[in-house]
Regions:
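Terminal non-domain segments
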Residues: 1, 134-138
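Concave beta-strand-loop units of leucine-rich repeat
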Residues: 1-2, 12-22, 28-43, 48-63, ...
């Protein structure tokens, strides 16, 4: 039962919580010095994120309802499952975090705070074709 699960205040390492679709009643650590992977969540209602994270995977979310991202996330924020950005509040500054929003079906309601444009990834980048390298041996 997740409601009775307890974590230490600070986790030094990655935390993966799988097989749950809701975070209602879940008490996470105050700080995760690593990655927090909750990709199985389909709703963020009731989710209270740690005050500090090195990365966040919530690729199962299809709606941002209830999601409150804080500024103190330094790695990748994977929200690639979101279909809509309506109501999504992005962090107002980045400590190097890149925010994946590659699943959006429309950009309606998407507000990217000033200075955050370089950190938001809206579409998968096509791999660039490799050019052959010619080496002349004498």
């Amino acid at each position: 039962d997740l409601e009775s699960a307890t974590f230490p205040k600070v986790v030094n390492g990655d935390v993966e919580i799988s097989g749950i679709t809701s975070a209602e009643g879940l008490k996470l650590p105050e700080e995760v010095l690593g990655l927090l992977d909750m990709s199985s969540l389909t709703t963020a209602v009731g989710l209270i994120l740690p005050s500090r994270l090195d990365g966040l995977y919530l690729s199962g979310l299809t709606s941002p309802e209830g999601l409150k991202l804080n500024n103190d996330i330094s790695g990748l924020i994977d929200l690639s499952g979101l279909k809509s950005a309506k109501g999504l509040e992005l962090p107002t500054k980045s400590y190097g975090a890149r925010i994946m929003l590659t699943g959006l079906e429309s950009y309606e309601g998407l507000v990217i705070p000033p200075g955050m444009e370089d950190y938001v990834i809206l579409k998968e980048e096509e791999p660039k074709p490799m050019k052959p390298i010619t080496v002349n041996a004498y």
